Amino acid sequence: MAGGSTGERPFTDIITSIRYWVIHSITIPALFIAGWLFVSTGLAYDAFGTPRPNEYFTQDRTEVPIVSDRYSAKQQVDRFSAK
């Protein structure tokens, strides 16, 4: 080991190993597919509590629901959700 070395494997050794690519050729596509399913099934909207694209505007409310006064924000949000 050279002076100041932490004893860890060099990064070039890791990314040129067959074991690295066997593991990552499975995990990287699996993460991509899991993320795509999370968003496409709508679970992301449910998990984070955001409205779906068709729920931003209802039949009764066509204006943009923007909170304009920070001190009366609760009342404004209640008015937006009551309509």
From Swiss-Prot:
Please state where this protein is localized.
Answer: Cellular thylakoid membrane
Which proteins does it associate with, and in what oligomeric form? Answer: Heterodimer of an alpha subunit and a beta subunit. PSII is composed of 1 copy each of membrane proteins PsbA, PsbB, PsbC, PsbD, PsbE, PsbF, PsbH, PsbI, PsbJ, PsbK, PsbL, PsbM, PsbT, PsbX, PsbY, PsbZ, Psb30/Ycf12, peripheral proteins PsbO, CyanoQ (PsbQ), PsbU, PsbV and a large number of cofactors. It forms dimeric complexes.
Which cofactor is recorded for it?
heme b
The annotation note on the cofactor reads:
With its partner (PsbF) binds heme. PSII binds additional chlorophylls, carotenoids and specific lipids.
Cytoplasm recorded as keyword: no
Q: What GO biological process terms are annotated to this protein in UniProt?
A: photosynthetic electron transport chain
Q: Which gene encodes it?
A: psbE
Which Gene Ontology molecular function entries are recorded, alphabetically?
electron transfer activity; heme binding; iron ion binding
Name the UniProt record assigns to this protein: Cytochrome b559 subunit alpha
Q: Where are the transmembrane segments?
A: 22-36
Q: Which Pfam families match?
A: Cytochrom_B559 (PF00283), Cytochrom_B559a (PF00284)
Q: Which GO terms describe its cellular component?
A: photosystem II reaction center; plasma membrane-derived thylakoid membrane
- Keyword Transmembrane among record annotations: yes
The family line of this record is: Belongs to the PsbE/PsbF family.
| Bilayer disposition of the protein | Single-pass membrane protein
